[in-house]
Amino acid sequence: MSRLQDFYKSKVAVDLQAKFGYKSVMEVPRITKITLNMGVSEAVADKKVIEHAVSDLTKIAGQKPVITKTRKAIAGFKIRENYPIGCMVTLRGQRMYEFLDRLVAIALPRVRDFRGISGRAFDGRGNYNIGVKEQIIFPEIEYDKIDALRGLNISITTSAKTDEEAKALLTAFSFPFRN
């Protein structure tokens, strides 16, 4: 079991149960999955770009991503149906907790001019989204070996019913919220 998973079971779940007055431990919100999504619009012109994005996301997540394809053709963007346009990976279980640990402890503090993450990026249902502008904040990516700076979206899905519960959960995992 990873460090954060132990921390959740021993400390966070107990604290949240006391704070929100849950009757059962199963009511306590938990992180169910983390989805990493990298949209690569440059892949329309050059097919090699998607391979670089897949290798970057594989290094970051620790598992092979799925290549996302366009659903329908859009002439204005010069894309046809089933064109590779990005890649995504869903993390659950131990890999999810290990990624969360690296994100909070190593990657986020490496962001240039970092003052904390926004507390307003919740979706109203207890899920949180973080946009990362550069993939080089992760220690697995070597600066010399990348072809271009690419951003990615990190979507943290929780079992919390409200944003307040989700924020309390992520704060317990020492997420550096600005407000």
From Swiss-Prot:
GO terms of biological process kind: translation
A GO cellular-component term linked to this record: ribosome
Keywords: Ribonucleoprotein, Ribosomal protein, RNA-binding, rRNA-binding, tRNA-binding
RNA-binding is among the record's keywords: yes
Alphabetized PROSITE patterns for the sequence: RIBOSOMAL_L5
Domain of life: Bacteria
Gene Ontology MF terms in the entry: rRNA binding; structural constituent of ribosome; tRNA binding
UniProt xrefs under InterPro entries: Ribosomal_uL5, Ribosomal_uL5_bac-type, Ribosomal_uL5_C, Ribosomal_uL5_CS, Ribosomal_uL5_dom_sf, Ribosomal_uL5_N
Presence of keyword Ribosomal protein: yes
Family: Belongs to the universal ribosomal protein uL5 family.
Subunit record text: Part of the 50S ribosomal subunit; part of the 5S rRNA/L5/L18/L25 subcomplex. Contacts the 5S rRNA and the P site tRNA. Forms a bridge to the 30S subunit in the 70S ribosome.
Function as written in the Swiss-Prot or TrEMBL entry: This is one of the proteins that bind and probably mediate the attachment of the 5S RNA into the large ribosomal subunit, where it forms part of the central protuberance. In the 70S ribosome it contacts protein S13 of the 30S subunit (bridge B1b), connecting the 2 subunits; this bridge is implicated in subunit movement. Contacts the P site tRNA; the 5S rRNA and some of its associated proteins might help stabilize positioning of ribosome-bound tRNAs.
UniProt xrefs under NCBIfam families: PRK00010.1 (NF000585)
Protein name: Large ribosomal subunit protein uL5
